[in-house]
Amino acid sequence: MNRIVDDQITLIPYYRNDDISLLWYQDSEVCKQVDNTDQIYNLTKLHKMYDYLTSHGSCYYIQYEGVLVGDVTLQDNSELSIVISKQYQNLQIGRRCVSEMIQLAKEQKMVKVSAQ
């Protein structure tokens, strides 16, 4: 079920969409932000990551003004992760999505949320 963040942002439950999501993870600067490595993702690594995230939490695509621009996950262990493609960073998209994920954590009776 979609989660409406505001009039610009909707969180859409994860589904395989390699054509778009692989592009985010083939940007070495984004990978540095996410994993602290310059290693970009290949399709196998992307699938392993999403398979893990979807089986251990709530994973969503971030749709901004009708365009998929990243993903955000709240894991069962209360860890939050977020990726936003470079051209959509610094628009406060992440801040708004994190607020929505904190709300989701409250709904799931999580006491705290952490991010690395």
Spans of features found by a protein language model:
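Short aromatic/hydrophobic contact patches that present stacked aromatics
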Residues: 10, 79-83, 114-116
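Conserved GNAT acetyl-CoA-binding A-motif
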Residues: 105-116
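Conserved acetyl-CoA-binding loop-helix of GNAT-fold acetyltransferases
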Residues: 90-105
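Short, well-ordered coil/turn elements that cap or connect secondary structure elements
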Residues: 6, 54-55, 107-108
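Short, solvent-exposed beta-strand edge segments and adjacent coil->beta transition regions
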Residues: 6, 77-79, 110-112
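Residue-level preference for hydrophobic side chains embedded in well-ordered alpha helices
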Residues: 21-22, 80, 97
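A short, well-structured alpha-helix characteristic of acyl/acetyltransferase catalytic modules
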Residues: 1-51
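Acetyl-CoA-dependent GNAT
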Residues: 36-87
